Every structure is written in structure tokens, then in C-alpha cells.
Curated annotation (Swiss-Prot):
EC number annotated for this UniProt entry: 6.1.1.5
Motif, 'HIGH' region: chain positions: 58-68
Name this polypeptide is given: Isoleucine--tRNA ligase
Reactions listed under catalytic activity: tRNA(Ile) + L-isoleucine + ATP = L-isoleucyl-tRNA(Ile) + AMP + diphosphate
Amino acid sequence: MAKYKETLNLPKTAFPMKANLAQREPQALKRWQAMDLYGKLRNAARGRPRFILHDGPPYANGAIHIGHAVNKILKDIIVKSKSLSGFDAPYVPGWDCHGLPIELNVEKKVGKPGRKIDVASFRRACRDYARKQVNAQREDFERLGVLGDWCHPYLTMDYQFEADVIRTLGKIIEKGHLHKGVKPVHWCVDCGSALAEAEVEYQEKTSPAIDVRFPVVEEVELLARCKAEIPGAGPMSVVIWTTTPWTLPANQAVALHPALKYVLVECSAGQGRERLLLAEGLYREVLARYSAESAVILATCQGDELEGLKLQHPFYERTVPIILGEHVNLEAGTGAVHTAPGHGQDDYVVGNRYQLSIDNPVGGNGCFLPETPLFAGEPVFKANDHIIQVLKERGNLLREQSLQHSYPHCWRHKTPIIFRATPQWFINMEREGLRTAALAEIKKTRWLPGWGQQRIEGMVENRPDWCISRQRAWGTPIPLFVHCQTGELHPDTPRLMEEVARRVEEKGIEAWFELEPKELLGNQAPAYEKVGDTLDVWFDSGVTHTCVLETREELGVPADLYLEGSDQHRGWFQSSLLTSVAIRGTAPYRMVLTHGFTVDAKGKKMSKSQGNVVAPQQVMGSLGADILRLWVAATDYRGEMNVSDEILKRIADSYRRMRNTARYLLANLNGFDPTIHGVPAKDMLALDRWALDRASLLQGEIVQAYEDYNFHLIYQRVHNFCAVDMGAIYLDIIKDRQYTTQADSRARRSAQTAMYHIAEALVRWLAPVLSFTADEIWQYLPGERGESVFLTTWYEDLPSLGEEAPWGRAFWDVILAAREAIAKVLEGVRVEGRIGSSLDAEVDLYVEESLYQALRKLGDELRFVLITSYARVYPAQKRPVEALETEMPGLWTVVIPSHYPKCVRCWHHREEVGSHEDHPELCSRCVENTEGGGEQRAFA
């Protein structure tokens, strides 16, 4: 064999079999940076139609986690695929740099502002901290292979950005959407600040659940309104149920549902006979809860018949009215709701209708104010026990028990929050029809998955006014002057805000905090108070449509796509929508796509304590970023995304299949120059045209899947193409032709041409996902080409077959189905030990008429398709009894271990081996290929 080895066209390439991604990717990244790949991509795309994916800013705090990696990789896949589709697809990354988490980390190092450090120095420390965090995160994002304008990202703490946020707030004020009010807001005692909806998370909490008597002051009037024929005996009370006893000091009313039925029940519930007003739909279970005895219904009435009746507060010397509210329901409690407008949104809304006092006896530290009777200075949650004790002493506690329920917590501190009425600045949801307009814009937007629309609609329909003010040091200021007497904004507010914005452009937010009012207001300064609040960070990020999309030349409004995690329906998607609609009346995006959260293999949330955290840095350092990218693409991101070391290892196995396919194509293109050696499609062998047709059809599916953001389908299709269409069929069949025919023969050049076209297409299919690997493949492809695969577009030189042409798809579908059926029979014979490989076999095929004609068309080349030494075709009626029925209807086969000698060059067993005097070890075909004019192939 040694003397014939040099006559074979064996595959050869410098493209490494071992990926060593963890070592090679950083080198590729340096190359991209040195060549300014993103800049070249921008230049190459100039003049194309634009596609704008707007980056929602991650928070500049801490190392990136697997969720960050998912988000950035998905965005990068989309941007790169859009570029390949012929779009100008810029990507400008950004960071959210203000807010509480940064403050808390800086506090740990330098202390609280105003105590251990002055506020200006504290803000400088926050800015320095955020900048370091941005740099660390940027390094990791780039390492993931994400292409973007990393040299010029947007930062919400940039002076220009801060100034533009102020200008945007000015526009919202001019449109009439801002108002100041005393409203109950989510308040974190540990933060010392109001919280946005998106900063609240719900956790299980155990609370005291108590039933409280509110004695009826006007008993006779209540009996009259209920048309009670028998007055009954004992004290009369309306009973409420609450899990927040600490809100009772602020009680201003008891709410009933106007349309619900209520019953007045006489019973014994531990204090002798008494009369209790309860909802008819709940009274049985309520009385059972009290272990009440001898219950008698005295009267029935509707809630709206009792409006305005006076009740006695359970421990203060004041009366409170019965009011009506649609928020009252029969899900739990008694059907009567304790109402404290200073401590709850529903209470606030109904209280406003009745002009109730918005009483807030709780300070920002979570303790009752000094003037609060009975409970002054007590922390509210600890005061629960004291309040319950007072209720017992007053005889107004009916029942006490513990209840585990879902309760709002601060997302940062993980501690229970309170509802607390404070003076705050709000974007009013009703003024100028903001809520209605926002809902209309939601309907005009495409949401993927579709349930996202219903989710955000429900949130916008039911959300309260947006509290945009915070009592923090590190944030964009709300630069307003309020009249000391009237509370009204300065009449020249728009001009003043623009002046402040100009100063902030030069000095940052410190320009406002250092500003003396007289610098802008002159003699009017003593009459006005300078607002010290800062903006909710969700306002900062929510106005990137004006501060980034509108201000950067390569971008524009609306963006084509916003893409974030599904938690952003109540976060960035919503804040962006509301601010954009408030300013320009339209949504800032055409489409919104959301991805699920990452969980471990068992669907559990990741946590260090569970030991199931997958850190992207570790994956990049071991398996490589491309494995992480392939996992993201392979997973249906619309639901939860399972990841673990084992899952990533399986992905790495799939990666090797695709890499090996690319390597095999490259190895067989050694010495091939497409401009010199390329064979026109019409002159190519039939099987090669079939392979190109498969690639052409697949490319259509892949481009469509990229268009539809179905990346997991791309992974499935490409992997299947590499494993089946290429590995199991085409490359397996042409191996003989590629290795044994003459180097410059049409048969070999035809196969090389097909492999060249397939490689050109494959490298582009892979590029958005396996970015490092695709660019590595690109460097080894023959022919002239640009510096990077990312500077090109989808490959367009893939010819396709017709369905019914003589050698069209229908023909090859039949042939390859027969091949698969025969291969299974051959495998059975091999397992039995009768043959070593399929080339040790001869097959006699007995077939029905339609299949007979198709197989006969291939003539002697059928054996190359089946990879057997002989393949003979006979009509089905001639089949012997030993013929085996295959899985293909109308096809039987007899497998015969060949007794002919084996050609040492092509390994086929042929009758004529040994008949050539000079080459006794070769078959006639190999003699022709080594000494003659070369064999001729037509089909395979």
C-alpha cells in the first residue's frame, strides 16, 4: 500500500482538530480589536437599510452572571444575523450607573453620606466605583464574542446623558404629566427611600392575621337601614380582618362592597352575646373561625345601604365612617376592609373619593412618629404585638392567628417593606390620557412571546401613578424650584431646567447639588425651595430612547427591537413605554422580545448555597465562549433555560460534530482554487448537485429562523445537516471519489466545488452563534476573501434542484431511502461477524418496478452510493427465499460477503484484482486512476 499512498488525494489542513477555544478565543479577540472589526463592519454597512436593537442597560454592579451572558449573546446573534441579511445593524451597549446598589457598596467602603463623608465626595466615590464596574463587565462581554461599540458605550452617569435626562423630564413636565402628591408608596426602611414597582419582589412572610371589632356608634340607624324586625342583644360591631395591625393607628374608615349582601348576626364569640356585621358569603366560615355559638341572623342588607354610618375606632377616641369600595371582595376576611389611605393604594384611591385624611404616623425609619398616641417611637413590625395587646384590653380583638403569605420585600435588602404616604413626584397615569395612549401603543407593538402583550397590558391597566422621586444621594436630580407657600413649580421651569442641563453637561449632576438658587432665580430665590430629590433609576434607563436613540447618529427612534428578560415587562419595557408615550405619543420600539431565566438542570433557581451556579467566566476559561453561545442558541429561550456542567458538556459534543464537519470540508479543499478548479453547476455530478440543493434549502430555513428569532431551530437544523446530510450521507459517499480519482479530474473537482460552496454557506450560518469558530474557519477557506466573515452577507451561490427533474429531489429521496434501508441490513450482517465493513460485502437487490428503474439509473455507481464492492439490481419477482425484506416497501436484499481479493488502494473487493501485471494489488479502476486517463463518473 505504501507505494500507492502518494497517488491518493488524502485530506490535509492546518485547521486544528482540537478547538482549544479557551486559548484561541482571546487571540481572536485581540485580532478583532486590532483590526477595529466593529468599525469596519460599520463602514461596510453604510447605506444599507437599518436595523436597531437597543441595548437595555445592565446595572454597573458586580461581575456578570449567566443571565447577563444569555442576554448579551442573544442580542449579538440577532445583530450579526441582521448584518449577514444585508442590514446596517449598529450595536451600542450601555450601563445603568446610578442608584441604591452602588450607594450601598460605596457606603461599605467610605461610610454613609453626610456622616462619615460629605455628600459630594460620596457621589465622586460612586462615580469611580461605577466606572470600575463598567470596565470589568465590558471585558467579560467582549470576551463572550459580542461585537459592539465598546469604546463608546452609553453610561447613564455620563454628563451628557445626565443633562439629557433632565431635558427629557422637562418635556414630560411641559406635556402636563408630572404632579406632586402625598401618596402611599413602597418604602424600604433600610434604603430610607421610596421604591419603584420593579424594585419590589414578593417573598413568603409570616404575619399576624387578626379580626377586629369596630363598634357601631349608630346602632338604631343601622337596624333601621337593615329593616331589622328583631333588634337582638349585645354590643354591635362591624368586623374587619387584617394582616397589618401596624396600619390600624392610621385607620380612617371601614369599606364595604356596594353590591355585596351583609348579615347582622347575633352570636356568642367569647364575650357573651353580641351582634356582628359580616358579608353573607363569608359569615359561616368567619363564625367557625371564632368558634361562635348560637348564631341567629337578625337582618340582611346590601353594602350601599350602610354608607356613612359611624363606627368607633378600636382604640382611639374618634369615629370613622362606613364607605364603599369596589376593591372589597370575598376571597378572605370578613367582607369589611379596614381603610388607611396613608398605607395602601386601594385605600388611597377610595379615601380620595371620600376626602379622607391621608394620615401617615410612620417615619422614614419605619418607626411611629413621636406624636403617635400609644405607640410613639416603636418600629412598626415590632409594634404589631403591642397593638394586638391594646385591642385585647379594649375588648375589640375577636381572633388572632399567624398567616404565611406573599408579602412585598425590597429587592436589594430582602426585607419586608411598608406602604407609607410621603410627598413625592409622580407621573400621572390619567393626565393627558397617558394610560389610554400607552395601552393603544402596546397593541401596535409586536410581542414575542405573544403572552408578553397581555402581561404588560394588565400591568399598565392596573398600575398606580409612577413615583419617580427618590431620597438618595447618587442619582440624577429632579432640578425643580417649588414655591414655599403655594407648592407650585416656578412659572419659568422649562427655561430653568434647560439652564441646569447645560451646567450638568459641563460638571455632571454636582452642578445642581452645588447650585445656589439665587444663581438662577436672583431676587426670587427666597420665595422658592430647591428640590433635593433624585430620579428613580428606572426613569434614567427608561428615557434612553431620547438620550441615546435620538442623540446618536447611527441610531434612531423607534428601535426595531428591545430584548430583555421577562421581568422587564414591569421594568424597562414599561418605563420606556410610558416616557416615550408621554413625550411623543408613540412607543419607543416596534417589537419586544423576552427571554426566560436561567435555572439548573432540575429547574431550580441558581444560588451559591445550592452550589448550582454556572459562572460564565469559568465556562469561557474552560470550554470557551463559543460553547456558551451554542448553549444559548440551542435552548428555547422563551421558557426557563436549563444549564449545568453536564448540559454544557453535551453542547460541547455537538460543537465537535460541527467543527469536525467544517474541518473535513477544509481538508478536502487542500489545493483547490475556486476560480481555477470550480465546476459549473450544470457540469457537476448528480450527487454533488443534490448536496448543494440540500444546502440551498437549508439556508432558506436558517435565514428564516434567524428572521423569526428561532435560534434553537437553527442549532437543530445545522447539527442535523452536519451529522446526517454531510456526515452520514454525502461526505461518506464521496470519500472514495475524493481520495481515489485523479486530482484534477472532473469527478474530484465537482465534489470539491460542492464542498467549497457548502463551506462558504456553513461558515456564515455558524457566524452569528459560533462567532470565534466561524471566523477561524474563514481564515482557512480557499479563494480571495475579506478579513472577516462578519464583513460579508449570506452566501448566494448555492444552486438548487427541481423536484421532478431526472436527477431531482424526488429521485434522490428514493435512492437515499433505499440506501438507509440497505445500510441497516448491512449493519446486522456486520454485527453477526460475517463482514468487517460494508466494502467487504456484495449486495443483490430485488425491487419493485418503480424503485427498479431508479436504482438501475445509477448503473455501476450504485455501489459507491451504498459503499459496497458490488451492487446488483434485479426485479422483485426473481428474489430467492433467502432475500431479506428491508424497511423500505418493495425492496429485498441478499448480502454476500465478497470472496474477491481486496484492492489495497480503494479497499473494494473486485474480481479483477491481480489481473494487471504491473499492479497485481489494484483493481482496474485504480489502475486507470494511477496510470491511465482516469475513471469517469456521472452520478456519485
